[in-house]
Amino acid sequence: MIDSYCYHPIHNRWQGIRPVSSPGILPTVVEQSGRGERAFDIYSRLLRERIIFLGTGVDDQVADALVAQMLFLEAEDPEKDIQIYINSPGGSVTAGLAIYDTMQQVAPDVVTICYGLAASMGAFLLCGGTKGKRLALPNARIMIHQPLGGAQGQAVDIEIQAKEILFLKETLNGLLAEHTGQPLNKIAEDTDRDHFLSPAKAVEYGLIDRVVDSLTGGGIVKEG
């Protein structure tokens, strides 16, 4: 007998954008030293400054990379902030929760900075940064909504997946309520459909703490 059940991963991703697993363009920088020239890809160079980029959709591969970078930076210096720049349409809920849990567990404060778009799981991770250190650039856009997914096959299999997606929806809504200070019923209402916010509105909502109007050298955020 052939099993006709087909599992569809549960996502928290804006469908207006197709996520990619890796950057299409990878600039390099060259440094001079007493030993000569040394070339780095730009992301490796910025990692030395404790800056991590989430500039793609969220999947297991991306989650593994971000978790590994955070653990490495924690081992390097458990007291110095980690900065995560986010421009992401979202993606896998379970992969996103793996990143989120690591953000909560590492010793350093995690500064989250939205540039471009933080949608779905991207917005959830933005909101999950250390309180007081969740930021957005002036023309960024932020969007929250409920998870999406599906299943096909026998009725019992579909029922199992329906229960799982409802569980994840309640989990995400509860965490958003905790981080924003909004009532759970308002989170549930606002995430029922795509809900876009400007940075200023996101501050009012509690998704972020302030809008950045300038950045100093080294990626350190200056009060605006």
Curated annotation (Swiss-Prot):
Gene Ontology biological-process entries: protein quality control for misfolded or incompletely synthesized proteins
EC number: 3.4.21.92
SUPFAM superfamilies according to UniProt: ClpP/crotonase
Keywords attached to this entry: Cytoplasm, Hydrolase, Protease, Serine protease
GO cellular component: cytoplasm; endopeptidase Clp complex
Record carries keyword Thylakoid: no
Subcellular location: Cytoplasm
Record protein name field: ATP-dependent Clp protease proteolytic subunit 1
Active site positions: 120, 145
CDD domains: S14_ClpP_2
Taxon lineage: Bacteria, Bacillati, Cyanobacteriota, Cyanophyceae, Synechococcales
Subunit structure, as described in the record: Fourteen ClpP subunits assemble into 2 heptameric rings which stack back to back to give a disk-like structure with a central cavity, resembling the structure of eukaryotic proteasomes.
Entry-linked PANTHER family: ATP-DEPENDENT CLP PROTEASE PROTEOLYTIC SUBUNIT
Catalytic activity: Hydrolysis of proteins to small peptides in the presence of ATP and magnesium. alpha-casein is the usual test substrate. In the absence of ATP, only oligopeptides shorter than five residues are hydrolyzed (such as succinyl-Leu-Tyr-|-NHMec, and Leu-Tyr-Leu-|-Tyr-Trp, in which cleavage of the -Tyr-|-Leu- and -Tyr-|-Trp bonds also occurs)
Any one GO molecular-function label of the UniProt entry: ATP-dependent peptidase activity
